[in-house]
Every structure is written in structure tokens, then in C-alpha cells.
Amino acid sequence: MSEKVNKTSLIHDAAFRKTLKDPAAARDFLEQVLTPYQKSRCNLDTIELEPTTFVAESLRQSACDVLLSMKTNDGKDGYIYTLIEHQSSPDKFIPLRMMRYILAVMEQHIEEHKCAPVVIPVLFYHGAKRPYPYPMNWVDCLDDPAYGREIYGEQKPFSLVDVSTLTDDEIEHYHRMAALMFTMKSGTSGDVIELIGKSITLTDKYGSSVHQNIVLTYL
């Protein structure tokens, strides 16, 4: 990875993390990402950003991992795990890497609490290659997916948020995340003055000066 690309990735990572540190912004994100059933099981009033220092360094070199925890509505612990990917050439094995993350989260929780939580994986993607070109079902990563399904059954694909496929109206539904997502979608192809104006409009409507500063730093 070139020094320029690595520096850009660090800026992206920091902007995404700083925004999701705000529980209200994290809630806006999850309100759009989770299915109605998942939302019915999650207590979104208990969202917390968790450390991910237990995740192996080899898994963290090319991705920014964000782990959000919350209680379920029946009082049990649960996790939402979001992975933000910055590679210009998407990796078709990302679902397998996310499986490793899921197991790492479970193992850490088992060590501390002697029980295994449900982990909901989400890939947030805004890479240069658009739209995201690969399946999100980890079984499709295998050399023989059909045989894999015979062994492992039909697995549900992981959730994907690809900003390049979202309309501006759809992005606005993410409220406090909208300004950052709009900027990520536009990338370097948009007019900077227009991007700044749109970002300010969105943060004035949904966010705060903190969110605005994050987006302006990103630009």
C-alpha cells in the first residue's frame, strides 16, 4: 500500500470512528442498516463503542474495524460489528475475514462472561471500484460454493452498505452519518465547494459542529 493511500485510509478510518463515537450517530446508522426483526431485538438506547485491541493485527492491517455493543431487549448482551473497507480493489474474501472477526468477538466475550453473544456483521464500503463487485455470502468465497452449501447449508449473506449505490435521498436517511457518507460517495470526483456546501447543509439539519468538523477534516 502506497504512503499516500495509507494516509488517506487513516483519514477515512478516523472520520468514520469519530462519527460513530457519538451514540446518536451510531443509532442513525443502525436504524438504516438493521432489519426490522433485528431492530426489534436490539435496545438501541444502550449503544457503546467497544475496543477491538483483541483482534489479531494481521486482520487489522487493511481495514478499520468498529465494534458496537448493545443490550438486547431481553437484557442480554449483543454486538453489531461493522467493518469499513478502503481498498481500491475489493477483496472477494472479505466475508471470510469478517467470519474471523466474528469468532474473535465471541471468544473474547466467552472469556469474560462465559456465554456467546450474537454478532451481526456489516460491511461499509466506499472503495474506488463501484459498485461492490463480490458476493457477501462467505460460502461463495470457497473454491466450490455448491459443495460448500452441501456441507454448511445455505448461509445468509452479510449486510452490505455500499455508498456508491445509495441515492442522495437514501443517504440523507442516515441523518448524523449523512454528511460523511455523502462526502465518501462523492470522493475526489466532486466539486469541493459543492461538497462543503452540501456537508454543511446536512450537518446543520441533522448533526452538530462536531460532525461538521469531522467532515471538513475529511475533505
What residues fall within each predicted segment?
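Elongated, amphipathic alpha-helical interaction scaffolds
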Residues: 1-219
